[in-house]
Curated annotation (Swiss-Prot):
Name of the gene: purA
Cofactor needs: Mg(2+)
Pfam families: Adenylsucc_synt
Species assigned in the record: Yersinia enterocolitica serotype O:8 / biotype 1B (strain NCTC 13174 / 8081)
Chain sites annotated for binding GTP: 13-19, 41-43, 306, 332-334, 415-417
GO MF term set: adenylosuccinate synthase activity; GTP binding; magnesium ion binding
Name the UniProt record assigns to this protein: Adenylosuccinate synthetase
Similarity remark: Belongs to the adenylosuccinate synthetase family.
PROSITE patterns per UniProt: ADENYLOSUCCIN_SYN_1 (PS01266), ADENYLOSUCCIN_SYN_2 (PS00513)
SUPFAM superfamilies: P-loop containing nucleoside triphosphate hydrolases
Metabolic or biological pathway: Purine metabolism; AMP biosynthesis via de novo pathway; AMP from IMP: step 1/2
Residues the entry annotates as binding IMP: 14-17, 39-42, 130, 144, 225, 240, 304
InterPro entries attached to this UniProt entry: Adenylosuccin_syn_GTP-bd, Adenylosuccin_syn_Lys_AS, Adenylosuccinate_synth_dom1, Adenylosuccinate_synth_dom2, Adenylosuccinate_synth_dom3, Adenylosuccinate_synthetase, P-loop_NTPase
GO BP annotations, alphabetical order: 'de novo' AMP biosynthetic process; IMP metabolic process
Length: 432
């Protein structure tokens, strides 16, 4: 009997999902991306060699795994080709291992132009997007005017549809944002030049996954970003434009919702956030800088330095609820090495003095919130690279146990370094 495992972030992204997916795919036949786009940055370190993936699933480096980009992903053809070329230059036969849904919306240059024009116009109120056209591409999808991978099968019809949509968006770019128009012919030529490469990888993803399920194959579904960036359940409007939560698996891949067996939530041992938006436990002091440097907290996609803070249990509990988490993988425990004390946010004090233990829904509700902390002893011992649970410092074990107690979810995997091997699997999701 096969197992279907979902791996997703429980915070604001950058929790370390890529490494965990890569590790667990040793037993998987398929790895599926079901939302987001090349705004994701999944870093893998295998035998000391670093690979950063933005669009292609993290199972691509394993020869026994088929990687799939599902319909919930917005696909930038140029970004995909660059990623494929880079991997192929290293000997990875991407075209033999990668499949696409024909329903993937395409991200094209006018989406990028709109994304950047809007951020510029917002000024101090900018959301902090990656500027890669993700939001505008999802807008076109919902408005039913977007172009999809499947449109590339008929190039004449594609050209007609593209002209209509370029004219539509150029009107907004030129007359509202006072920016330069996007060149229709240039966009058309660039896309058609690689159209046959993309269409050659197209498959009926829902049918494929259902057949795999019936055969008993193990499948993994790889989330991007994190729960608190979900378009519906995140800190709106400082969110991404897709459903980053477990509910997005069914809609973004075509797998029936009853066929998810285990949901693994990746939780970093502290909190980080890129871009604007609420962050109650943010540390703008020496400890915050310590976490940033020790954790190398700089975005794999944008290179921006990440905001850092203590682990927010209140926010993580919201992720537990929304995703019906089966277990946690705690990452970057080693970054806390050397701190005399560590803190967990266990509640919020509202501006009117009330104490609450749930997160607000919209960004406005987070204004003026103060974190309520529980302080625990830190540890001086080095946990980096430790591969045996019994060899972790007692204070670190106490920290992990307290997270389990406060969330009601077991920590099934512990990561103590970036390499695939620097991991303790206490309970394998495929065996749970």
């Amino acid at each position: 009997m096969g197992k279907n495992v979902v791996v997703l972030g429980t915070q604001w992204g950058d929790e370390g999902k890529g490494k965990v997916v890569d590790l667990l795919t040793e037993r998987a036949k398929y790895v599926v991306r079901y939302q987001g786009g090349h705004n994701a940055g999944h870093t893998l370190v295998i035998n000391g060699e670093k690979t950063v993936l933005h669009l292609i699933p993290s199972g691509i480096l394993r020869e026994n795994v088929t990687s799939i980009i599902g319909n919930g992903v917005v696909l930038a053809p140029d970004a995909l080709m660059k990623e494929m070329t880079d991997l192929e230059a290293r000997g990875v036969p991407v075209r033999e291992r990668l499949l696409l849904s024909e329903a993937c919306p395409l991200i094209l240059p006018y989406h990028v132009a709109l994304d950047n024009a809007r951020e510029k116009a917002r000024g101090a109120k900018a959301i902090g997007t990656t500027g890669r056209g993700i939001g505008p591409a999802y807008e076109d999808k919902v408005a039913r005017r977007g172009l999809r991978v499947g449109d590339l099968f008929n190039k004449e019809t594609f050209a007609i549809k593209l002209k209509e949509i370029v004219d539509y968006h150029n009107f907004q770019l030129v007359h509202y944002y006072k920016e330069e128009a996007v060149d229709y012919q240039k966009v058309l030529d660039e896309v058609l030049a690689i159209a046959d490469i993309l269409t050659a990888m197209v498959v009926d993803v829902s049918e494929l996954l259902d057949s795999a399920r019936k055969r008993g194959d193990f499948m993994m579904f790889e989330g991007a970003q994190g729960t608190l960036l979900d378009i519906d359940h995140g800190t709106y409007p400082y969110v991404t434009s897709s459903n980053t939560t477990a509910g997005g698996v069914a809609t973004g891949s075509g797998l029936g919702p009853r066929y998810v067996d285990y949901v693994l939530g990746i939780v970093k041992a502290y909190s980080t956030r890129v871009g604007a938006g609420p962050f109650p436990t943010e540390l703008n002091d020496e400890t915050g800088e310590f976490l940033r440097k020790q954790g190398n907290e700089y975005g794999a996609t944008t290179g921006r330095s990440r905001r850092t803070g203590w682990l927010d249990i209140v926010a993580v509990r919201r992720a537990v609820q929304i995703n019906s988490l089966s277990g946690f993988c705690m990452t970057k425990l080693d970054v806390l090495d050397g701190l005399k004390e560590v803190k967990l946010c266990v509640g919020y004090r509202m501006p009117d003095g009330r104490e609450v233990d749930t997160t607000p829904l919209a960004a406005e509700g987070w204004e003026g919130i103060e974190p309520i902390y529980e302080t625990m002893p830190g540890w001086s011992e080095v946990t980096f690279g430790v591969k045996e649970h019994s060899k972790l410092p007692q204070a670190a074990l106490n920290y992990i146990k307290r997270v389990e107690e406060l969330t009601g979810v077991p920590v099934d995997i512990i990561s103590t370094g970036p390499d695939r091997e620097e991991t303790m699997i206490l309970r394998d999701p495929f065996d749970a």
